A protein has these predicted regions:
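Internal interaction segment
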Residues: 89-90, 94-168
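Short, surface-exposed beta-strand/loop "edge" segments at domain boundaries and coil↔beta transitions
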Residues: 37, 60-67, 79-81, 123, ...
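A structural detector for beta-sheet-dominated domains
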Residues: 44-46, 57-59, 74-76, 84-86, ...
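Extended low-complexity, serine/threonine- and proline-enriched intrinsically disordered segments
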Residues: 67-95, 134-135
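Assembly/interface hotspot detector across virion components, adhesins/toxins, and nucleic-acid enzymes
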Residues: 19, 43-45, 129
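Generic marker of residues within folded, mature protein domains
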Residues: 14, 46, 61-63, 73, ...
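An ectodomain-focused feature that recognizes extracytoplasmic/extracellular
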Residues: 25-75
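Bacterial Sec-dependent N-terminal signal peptides
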Residues: 1-28
Length: 168
């Protein structure tokens, strides 16, 4: 039984290592919405032309972004930001763990969306994010933070993207 859990953990770790971006600077967290399922969220900042975007990627066993998702952010100073987005990609990875004569499937779904954000809204993120809600299926992803985990880091990623563009 001990080897069973070790095998499952190794397969899951390999799935996450294989699907995670290696060169992108991201900020993220893992969240268990229900007792049986959870998700891993990663956020990064990119600049395309003159627009800035927050790229959000969810890895889960069943959660996907809608075609036109919405991200609602509440800062620790009480400001509420609503960002409109669009689905830009998705996929799944499947593997199996062999236990005796049985194969236990392990599937991970990956869904990515981009949300347009202004420099003024990035300035508000410097106050820290206390709550984030993303419209997804089969249920919305909502996470409340007691202390900031992603707000200041997203703001710093914005400053890096801005400096990279200006220092060309």
């Amino acid at each position: 039984m001990k080897h069973l859990f070790q095998n499952i953990i190794v397969v899951i770790a390999l799935l996450f290592a294989y699907t995670s971006p290696s060169s992108a600077q991201t900020v993220g967290y893992t969240y268990k919405a229900l007792a049986a399922e959870g998700c891993s969220m990663k956020y990064r900042v990119v600049k395309q032309d003159t627009n800035y975007y927050i790229i959000a990627t969810v890895r889960s066993d069943r959660m996907n972004f809608l075609k036109e998702p919405t991200m609602k952010i509440r800062t620790f100073s009480g400001d509420v930001i609503t960002l409109k987005g669009e689905l830009i990609g998705g996929g799944s990875e499947s593997a199996g763990v062999v236990i005796g004569s049985m194969v236990i499937p392990v599937t991970e779904i990956r869904s990515t969306a981009q949300f347009s954000i202004t420099p003024e809204e990035f300035e508000l993120l410097n106050n820290g994010i206390s709550k984030v809600r993303l419209s997804m299926i089969p249920m919305d992803h909502e996470r409340t933070f007691k202390k900031d985990k992603i707000g200041k880091k997203l703001y710093l990623l914005y400053l890096k993207a801005k400096a990279k563009d200006e220092d060309f």
